[in-house]
């Protein structure tokens, strides 16, 4: 799956359109049980509301750096509603803690700065990398596998990362792919006497998709579940190979916000114990096998 993520800005919908969107509590978009209201009534969650009184009734600001289909994206039925794995989990986390949440959008490459500076309280699931851990902490509960997006028919015959030599990869600025995966593969290519991997740096995933569609890029690497969903929604594209990554994915929270980190960790433990996260992973396309025991990093 991909987490550095990671962020698919739906074509034609800008981040500013939904800036400041109010809490997703207003309309749950998944049928999975236990639902948000169920967690609000659980004894374990009532205990957490007592343990973290400063969060009860608080509006938690969720920063978004674009949209990633399957993780967080405007609903096709009602674009004013953000749906996906992250909103489904945020609904349950905030309900368990007696809090509320709202969304604000911006550029992906400044998302962590927004969280560490306090402009946002928490972000969507992202790759947990050593570089990011220098700036931010995480509450992580998933393992990562990248998928790929190609033009229909795979005209460049790209079947694995080894086929990226001499090709152009679209990558979002600040993403794991841009900072690590592509540079490392390019180094392997040149060491083998092959052409380097070119990188087309863009500001969000929507631009990456458009780059593949227009031919400016040969491939886009993103979370595996998102890659499948993107290709399914756009008949000019197809999903390709996958890459296992030695990375977990988690919610970024400021290092100095120990209360929120501890509260989210505790709430996620309740959610995992209920079986809801595995069900949500299957429902939104990431696959329940990606779940790992929730941990705090950083």
What are these regions (language model features)?
Residues 143-151, 228-269, 286-298:
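Periplasmic-binding protein-like
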Residues 110-113, 126-135, 182-184, 211-245:
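A ligand-binding cleft/hinge motif common to bilobed small-molecule-binding domains
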Residues 85, 102-113, 156-157, 195-210, ...:
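Short helix-initiation/N-cap motifs at beta->coil->alpha
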Residues 27-43, 87-96, 155, 162-168, ...:
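Extended ligand-binding regions for polar small-molecule ligands
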Residues 27-126:
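Extracytoplasmic small-molecule ligand-binding "clamshell" domains
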Residues 87, 100-163:
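Acidic, polar ligand-binding/catalytic clefts
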Residues 31-50, 176-199, 235, 239, ...:
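Ligand-binding clefts/hinges and TM-proximal coupling segments of bilobed small-molecule sensing domains
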């Amino acid at each position: 799956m991909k987490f550095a993520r990671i962020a698919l800005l739906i074509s034609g919908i800008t981040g500013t359109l939904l800036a400041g969107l109010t809490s997703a509590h207003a309309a749950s978009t998944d049928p999975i049980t236990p639902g948000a209201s169920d967690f609000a009534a659980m004894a374990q969650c009532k205990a957490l509301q007592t343990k973290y009184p400063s969060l009860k009734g608080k509006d938690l600001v969720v920063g978004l750096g674009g949209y990633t289909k399957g993780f967080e994206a405007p609903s096709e039925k009602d674009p004013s509603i953000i749906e996906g794995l992250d909103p489904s989990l945020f609904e349950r986390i905030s309900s368990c803690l007696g809090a509320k949440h709202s969304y604000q959008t911006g550029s992906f490459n400044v998302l962590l700065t927004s969280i560490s500076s306090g402009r946002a309280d928490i972000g969507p699931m992202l790759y947990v990398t050593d570089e990011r851990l220098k700036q931010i902490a995480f509450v992580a509960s998933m393992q990562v596998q990248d998928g790929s997006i190609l033009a229909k028919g795979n005209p460049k015959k790209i079947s694995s990362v080894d086929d990226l030599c001499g090709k152009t990869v679209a990558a979002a600025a600040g993403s794991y792919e841009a900072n690590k995966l592509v540079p490392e593969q390019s180094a392997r290519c040149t060491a083998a006497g092959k052409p380097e991997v070119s990188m087309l740096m863009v500001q969000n995933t929507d631009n990456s998709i458009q780059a593949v569609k227009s031919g400016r890029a040969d491939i886009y690497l993103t979370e595996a579940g998102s890659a499948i969903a993107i290709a399914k929604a756009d008949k000019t594209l197809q999903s390709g190979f996958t890459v296992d990554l030695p990375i977990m994915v988690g919610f970024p929270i400021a290092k100095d916000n120990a209360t929120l980190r501890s509260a989210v960790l505790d709430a996620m433990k309740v959610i995992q114990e209920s079986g809801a996260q595995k069900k949500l992973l299957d429902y939104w396309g990431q696959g329940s096998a990606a779940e790992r025991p929730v941990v705090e990093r950083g």
